[in-house]
Every structure is written in C-alpha cells, then in structure tokens.
C-alpha cells in the first residue's frame, strides 16, 4: 500500500543532509546509508549511494528512472541459490 499523498514521500533527515552537502561540493564520494525505506528524490540523480542489505553495503548509482522508488528495492537482501534438484534424475 503506497504512502498517503497528504503526508508526502519519506526520506531520512541525515540522508537528505548528506545528499545536499554532496551536491553543494560536487562530490562523487559514495554515501553510506542504512535507510532502505527512504524514497529516491530528483536531487539524488547522479550520486552513488551504498545501501545496506543486512550484511554489506551495495553500491547503487541513482538514475532518473529510479526517482520515486525506495532505496531498498535496489539492494537485494536474499540470495537465491536455485531449487534443489531431483537426486534420482541425476543418477541416470
């Protein structure tokens, strides 16, 4: 369920501060964040954010197509190794 329009999109205040500082200084330094729930704003386009997936930080380069999505969508938390195979089929 999407967030109410009267509330507006959510962004962590410390992440917003880091993004604004990076824009002012034209810094290309990677910004680390644990805030997977923050919405991507147009101000973030062109920056690289390191989003935590629970184990490590995944670098995410923000493009125009990502605006409006959440940061957590681009940092997968689960690893899929494939379904278990049929042991009888392998023996043949």
Swiss-Prot record:
Is Ribonucleoprotein tagged as a keyword? yes
Quote the PROSITE patterns the UniProt record gives.
RIBOSOMAL_S19 (PS00323)
Alphabetical list of SUPFAM superfamilies matching this protein: Ribosomal protein S19
Q: Which GO terms describe its cellular component?
A: cytoplasm; small ribosomal subunit
What's one Pfam family here? Ribosomal_S19
Question: Which Gene Ontology terms describe the biological processes this protein takes part in?
Answer: ribosomal small subunit assembly; translation
What terms describe the molecular function in GO for this protein? rRNA binding; structural constituent of ribosome
Q: Which UniProt keywords apply?
A: Ribonucleoprotein, Ribosomal protein, RNA-binding, rRNA-binding
Entries under Gene3D superfamilies matching the protein: 30s Ribosomal Protein S19, Chain A
Question: Which PANTHER family does its entry note?
Answer: RIBOSOMAL PROTEIN S19P FAMILY MEMBER, SMALL RIBOSOMAL SUBUNIT PROTEIN US19M
> What is the documented function of this protein?
Protein S19 forms a complex with S13 that binds strongly to the 16S ribosomal RNA.
The protein depicted here goes by the name Small ribosomal subunit protein uS19
- As recorded in Swiss-Prot or TrEMBL, the protein's gene is named rpsS
